[in-house]
Curated annotation (Swiss-Prot):
Organism: Vibrio parahaemolyticus serotype O3:K6 (strain RIMD 2210633)
The protein's role, per its UniProt record: Catalyzes the conversion of GTP to 2,5-diamino-6-ribosylamino-4(3H)-pyrimidinone 5'-phosphate (DARP), formate and pyrophosphate.
Cofactor(s) for this UniProt protein: Zn(2+)
Protein's name according to its UniProt entry: GTP cyclohydrolase-2
A GO MF term: zinc ion binding
């Protein structure tokens, strides 16, 4: 059974001005170092907190890549939760689970005209290798059973529900369109069935 290992105060956001806590876990299904970032002690003060499962994206979250909208989605969520509370489950699932180097290989194929899913398939991977069991384990360790899920991705909704988490509302993020990510976002809508207006 998963449990919280450590809970530490820190400040987050583009200007490091939003109070939050970062939590580590023990007893998760794998040895990946997933973390939770909690705003306004939402796990203890809210019956149905906002929750976002955000898969690690070094290129988008850290380097603000033009190829995706991951960093913008993360920052939008941090701002929203900084105001109203919530929980970000930051999952170490780079490139929809294929890993950083394979994602860079997929970028090369995307530069040659493939979309994000075609590139992953060409490299021998399924569309999405992520498993959200550990996200459910993290929520259980926090005592959270009902949530308002921040996502555009139907797979996340479906899998969390399968793991027994009650989703009372789905809150979509904005479409963060910029020069370089239009094809990526269109593929997420047409192929991944994401709820985005692009």
């Amino acid at each position: 059974m998963a449990e919280v290992r450590a809970r530490v105060d820190f400040k987050v956001g583009a200007k490091s001005n939003i109070d939050a806590e970062i939590l580590s876990f023990r007893g998760l299904k794998t040895d990946k170092e997933h973390v939770a970032v909690i705003f306004k002690q939402a796990d203890q003060t809210q019956d149905t907190p906002l929750v976002r499962m955000h898969s690690e994206c070094l290129t988008g979250d850290v380097f603000h890549s033009s190829r995706c909208d991951c960093g913008e989605q993360l920052e939008e969520t941090i701002q929203r939760m900084g105001e109203s509370g919530g929980v970000i489950l930051y999952l170490r699932q780079e490139g929809r689970g294929i890993g950083l180097y394979n994602k860079i290989d997929a970028y090369r194929l995307q530069s040659q005209g493939m979309n994000t899913y075609e590139a992953n398939n060409h490299l021998g991977f399924d569309d999405d290798l992520r498993d959200f069991t550990e996200a459910a384990q993290m929520l259980e360790a926090l005592g959270i059973k009902k949530i308002r899920l921040v996502t555009n991705n139907p797979k996340k909704i479906r899998e969390l529900a399968e793991y027994g988490i009650e989703i009372v509302e789905v809150v979509n993020t904005s479409a963060h369109i910029k020069d370089g990510n239009e094809n990526y976002l269109r593929a997420k809508v047409s192929h991944g069935k994401h709820n985005l207006k692009v």
